[in-house]
Amino acid sequence: HGFMPIVVKVVEQDEYDEWVFNKREEAIKLAELTTKDWSTAELMERGQTVYEVNCVACHQTEGQGIAGIFPALAGSEIALYEKDRHIEILMEGVQGAAMNSFDYLSEVELAAVITYSRQAWGNAEAGDGEIVIPKDIVDYKEPKI
């Protein structure tokens, strides 16, 4: 075994109880995210809202982007076929480009906006039409061993 330091933080009972409560709430939320049966329509509705708030300034209303500055999402290989890469880009951003990480969005918001951009502007018909569900985002966040 390697060196495994243990850190103990002593807190008042009230603070500990609040921590336990929050951990339980997180576990319940995670269970709901990973077991809910998400419809494409539900993800699209949420995704459009997230897109309009976070993405439209660069990628434009119809996903056409701005030539030479911000890439189009309409008809792009990533939006048509590369689901895992699409998740990675939103989670990590693109180094050396204007695309920042959006990892501060919730799992539901991320799944919804990715699904929206994979389904809108004819992308569903032109590509694989694969949706992203919150569990896909949870799985992406799991540590890789």
What annotation goes with each model-predicted range?
Residues 14, 53, 97:
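Glycine-centered loop/turn positions within well-structured domains
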Residues 81, 85-112:
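Active-site/pore-lining binding-face segments in mid-to-C-terminal subdomains
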Residues 7-13:
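Short beta-strand edge segments in extracellular beta-sheet folds
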Residues 8, 73, 90, 113:
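Hydrophobic, well-ordered secondary-structure elements that form the walls
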Residues 7, 72, 98-101:
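Conserved beta-strand positions that form and line the central face of beta-propeller blades
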Residues 2-5:
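Extracellular and select intracellular beta-sandwich modules with Ser/Thr-enriched
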Residues 40-66, 74-92:
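Sequence/structural segment immediately N-terminal to covalent heme-attachment motifs in c-type
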Residues 13, 17-48, 100-145:
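Flexible coil segments in periplasmic/lumen-exposed cytochrome c-class electron-transfer proteins
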